[in-house]
From Swiss-Prot:
Residues 5-90 form the Acylphosphatase-like domain. Its EC number is 3.6.1.7. Coiled coil: none annotated. Keywords: Hydrolase. InterPro entries: Acylphosphatase, Acylphosphatase-like_dom, Acylphosphatase-like_dom_sf, Acylphosphatase_CS. PANTHER family: ACYLPHOSPHATASE. It catalyses: an acyl phosphate + H2O = a carboxylate + phosphate + H(+). It comes from Vibrio parahaemolyticus serotype O3:K6 (strain RIMD 2210633). This is Acylphosphatase.
Length: 90
């Protein structure tokens, strides 16, 4: 299995609406590891590690997010693989 890590920056109305909780839940549902973290500028940083196909599915989900959020844009970049335990909310 070819595993990788990708870092996402999600912009929009994504803080104070349960975005990190739902992101963590979706990541675990897909078997990914990583984290979701609020940034000072109002964006959310998401790190996801796992099989490329699952990360692609996760990216599609991030484009919409939960119903409580309004996602304006998602940027995506590959980063060095790091082993994470679970999918944390930071």
């Amino acid at each position: 299995m070819n595993v990788k890590c990708e870092r996402f920056i999600v912009k929009g109305h994504v803080q104070g609406v349960g975005f990190r909780y739902h992101t963590s839940h979706q990541g675990l549902k897909l078997g990914l590891t990583g984290y979701a973290k609020n940034l000072n500028n109002g964006d959310v940083e998401v790190m996801a590690c796992g099989p490329k196909e699952k990360i692609d599915q996760f990216c599609e989900w991030l484009q919409e997010g939960p119903r409580t959020a309004t996602v304006e844009s998602v940027t995506r970049e590959s980063v060095s693989y790091k082993p994470f335990r679970g999918f944390k909310i930071l």
